């Protein structure tokens, strides 16, 4: 059964369609078998833990108790989260509380000697909350278990004796609902429970138990004690109009991902949720049943990963002046005392600046308002930012950040933000770089949730400010620290500066991105998590929340970039731009680039291609991994292995070096030139130049002189003519060795050709040039005739020992051992070739990072007008690239001719499965050959 058929059957099951009402094509999927439909319905219902009484399964399984027992059995076996959404059935009917559920799961795991890493992420977090068993405790218990003898005991009995006997759940919120659990006469009989706990049980029984009451109206210690004894259980109510905020994750366990439906749902909502969007609106954007969204958000709050914003205040809003404030609170004083002792901020009534939502305080149980003593008061949906309640911030940057947050929160609820797209390389160096303990929670949030919201950036920046690069001695650690500083500067630059006006206002302000009004705010978005959403959902989420997307550069090839037409995206325009196709397209359009060969998947290299005979290292670019450099001696086995699973682009990277110094070997071996990138300016291999490029027409209007070395490569001994002339900038790439360096490389003519070809003046990023160093052979006696040359060479051979000290550096390279007839020397020749163009803001180079950010301000690239121009340029680039790919392999987009290039707000037919080449494509000496 294919995936589309499964989705169709699931739709009928969710809609409670009986067998007789199924359409004929659905019955044909099941081979006209009513039994198969029943089996599929049972399997789907248990897997998704559906309620028995409100779903189709009730018509196939008449025993409700047996159905829930099967859910528990399979859920424990598969290490699935406790099904809190059917807790009202599992506890009163089966007496299966979260504590008993996880106790059984832990016993089975330890009995079978499974690793702690096999417990899925969210399940492991809930085990810590209920059992108090984390990774270290699990290892300690396993060691104790192995050390104990169980000759006359069962393994499970030994393990049970090591595990806790009561629930350790203590992190309870006052607004959660307390419900009566499974009746236990032994525990409830007179004298075994304190009077305060008996009062709570009696009150819950009188209110029919299942309806429940808010935990905050009872003594906190009594509530926790009853939960630990299993006499009551907790429900976390979430309503359609609630808003949820997700602070940096604390206590998250990074184990394996289970991949079941609910875990996928949790991650999908994790990256999409924000505190400005109600639960109802979020379900509409994701097109997911609102009950499933409420289940996920309820679990977030239960695990401590999220906070509900529109809470009923713990303290009274207007206490009477003649009495103490807490005497007018409906909440038990123990909760107020607990928050005062353990929390920095007591939940307060929520202020509102939007008159349209003046009466939206959540009623935690709207259906049972009278029974649960839940009241509602007049307040708004927009919460006071926690940072505004803290003390004065430490520095001016943090003050600005506080102003940004305040201006954002007091503005329109639908204010859009800037989205900065990152990949897992950012989270890797934040977690593994030993940069500070405070950064780890933020890194885990960025990796697991896939987003770091604007509200959490102030604390994130404070942690980044603590990094001192000079403290790190190790070069790799210092590199991580430098990258973190670049990330900090980028966040601060984007967060505190830009206003992007979505309206048609013509006002522009170069210092603020061209818009007016409140500052945007900034969200950090993981491309991996965002791409886990299906395409239509991803487009809706991005369009709703963001005014512009900006990618880090370069994004890893291992992950697809976030593609978007609306909002405008300063990153790879389509997936193909993020692949080797764009490199080949760049070389063919500019007419310059390293000699390259694109090999289809399955090709076998039997010998090294002749265009690489003088190379030392080759750049290997698979379609789904980052490029790597390979020594020429290892090229064949390495590339042939990669070609088994992926097409490969091979490009010349470095060349064999000839030594021009005296008394040294002429040919430097591969092993002696492993280090291809040096800190020396003359030995620099790659140059990264930010764009847009500065206009050089203002330099007095006078042309510059360039020294070209014109070579003829048809023979081994090359005759050269050195000429100095005034030439056009666009025709000079081969230059003398001292012409360009890191200070003036930005004036190289090839850069301006690339910018004009791809309209880079409306975007930002950087161009990478490869410094090609080759050696040519010079004839030092080209002023004499051949006869004199031969005679001179004979005399040189006869008197070699007498003339060694008088020879210049070029004669030191003379091939005396082979008795050559000519005096030949090697001379270095440099050529600067485009390697790639990267869109976005670089993080790996602090200097380049500052230069790109300065370009954004200088050219006003985030203005409303430029956003439209950039969108048009990106669309044209995408269409041209599609046509180029289609000209080299079977077309993947047959409707390219029907696409209107002027409709910048419509999506292009890009696909994540980048097309594979079907033939060998070569780029040699500026010519593309198919």
Curated annotation (Swiss-Prot):
It comes from the Eukaryota. Residues 352-392, 780-822 have a biased composition (Low complexity). Residues 349-397, 780-823 are annotated as: Disordered. Disruption phenotype: No visible phenotype. Transmembrane segments: none annotated. InterPro entries: FAM91, FAM91_C_dom, FAM91_N_dom. PANTHER family: PROTEIN FAM91A1. Belongs to the FAM91 family. This is Protein FAM91 homolog. The lineage of its organism: Eukaryota, Amoebozoa, Evosea, Eumycetozoa, Dictyostelia. The gene is fam91.
